[in-house]
């Protein structure tokens, strides 16, 4: 407060929560760009592309829901969808379901939650290698398992992405642990994302920009993607919002979106929508019952999603055959 926003160009603004820091950075770049009447990307670097590849996102879900989410993403113009795997659903069944509905141009980025050991995850990746729809896997191993990452990368053909590198991202790159790295959320602020993005580009290693928000944050990610030479794609969860503060949504055509050319972020806020959202009562979450039916005949009841590794002692994906349902 009371400071010149130009004091914070490329600053991390580390106030404890990366999403808030990056949201604040987006607001500052919007203000600076509008002050100078230039697009925000001109304050970040030299523009190298007019459009940036973008990915849709969905929550962990059973195969039949995953099929519908893929169709939704295709209908919205995406060629790529990210989803976290989880203990409760079978990634092989999800992949089989995806192959039945996805067009040949479509790919999945699975996030494996950085919770497994090499002996568990390698056989899973070897099987997924046979699927044309699996494009990449994020965080297949515990992040601090440096030797495991190196050995896994040597043994699999699936490109591996690392999110939240424990050594800061550049040491992991020098050790050859991953084929690409996630920048943005949970990895430091905007300055860190820009610095690592340029460093990865110099090393000819792709990065993925991940932020969370609607059109405003999506625009910010596109401005970053406009100047980083080796950006693979962005993920912002914009596809999950039925409502948005912007007067116009950013289009997705053939898997990519145009970099806004207006001053600042290049997105205009609908003030009337903003006021309606401010006045709205918070949504109430329903209480849900989780039912896990194991292959041996046992049934486990839980409040919501149970922590199966803690309850039954096996790593995600190492035991198959159970079915999980949620009921209100």
State what each model feature region is.
Residues 1-35, 298-303, 314, 322:
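Metal- or metallocofactor-binding catalytic centers and their adjacent structured scaffolds
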Residues 1-3, 12, 133, 144-159, ...:
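Shared catalytic-loop signature of beta/alpha-barrel
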Residues 24, 37, 81, 137, ...:
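Conserved, mostly hydrophobic/aromatic
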Residues 25-30, 41, 96, 122-125, ...:
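Predominant activation on well-ordered alpha-helical scaffold segments within soluble catalytic domains
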Residues 33-34, 38-52, 257:
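N-terminal amphipathic alpha-helix/helix-capping segment at the start of soluble metabolic enzymes
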Residues 39, 79, 107, 159, ...:
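Residue-level detector of anion-binding/catalytic polar loops
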Residues 45-156:
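Metal-dependent enolase-superfamily TIM-barrel catalytic cores that perform enediolate-based chemistry
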Residues 247-328:
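C-terminal extensions of enzymes
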């Amino acid at each position: 407060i009371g400071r010149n926003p130009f004091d914070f160009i490329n600053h991390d603004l580390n106030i404890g929560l990366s999403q808030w820091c990056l949201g604040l950075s987006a607001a500052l770049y919007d203000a600076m760009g509008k002050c100078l009447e230039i697009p925000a990307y001109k304050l970040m670097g030299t523009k190298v592309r007019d459009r940036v590849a973008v990915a849709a996102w969905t929550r962990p879900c059973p195969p039949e829901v995953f099929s519908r989410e893929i169709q939704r993403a295709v209908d919205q113009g995406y060629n790529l969808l990210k989803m976290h795997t989880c203990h409760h659903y079978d990634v092989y069944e999800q992949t089989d379901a995806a192959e039945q509905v996805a067009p040949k141009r479509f790919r999945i980025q699975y996030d494996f939650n950085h919770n497994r050991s090499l002996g568990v995850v390698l056989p899973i990746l070897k099987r997924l290698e046979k699927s044309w729809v699996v494009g990449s896997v994020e965080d297949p191993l515990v992040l601090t398992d440096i030797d495991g990452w190196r050995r896994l990368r040597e043994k699999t053909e699936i490109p591996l992405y690392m999110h939240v590198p424990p050594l800061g991202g550049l040491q992991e790159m020098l050790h050859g642990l991953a084929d690409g790295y996630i920048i943005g959320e949970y990895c430091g602020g905007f300055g860190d994302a820009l610095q690592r993005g340029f460093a990865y580009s110099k090393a000819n290693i792709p990065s993925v920009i991940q932020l969370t928000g609607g059109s405003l944050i999506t625009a910010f990610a596109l401005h970053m993607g406009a100047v980083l030479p080796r950006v693979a794609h962005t993920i912002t969860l914009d596809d999950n919002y039925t409502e948005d503060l912007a007067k116009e949504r950013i289009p997705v055509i053939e898997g990519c979106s145009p970099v806004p050319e207006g001053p600042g972020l290049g997105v205009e806020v609908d003030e009337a929508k903003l006021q309606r959202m401010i006045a709205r009562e918070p949504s109430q979450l329903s209480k849900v019952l989780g039912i896990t039916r194991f292959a041996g005949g046992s049934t486990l009841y839980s409040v919501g999603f149970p922590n199966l590794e803690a309850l039954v002692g096996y790593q995600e994906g190492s035991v198959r055959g159970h079915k999980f349902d949620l009921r209100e």
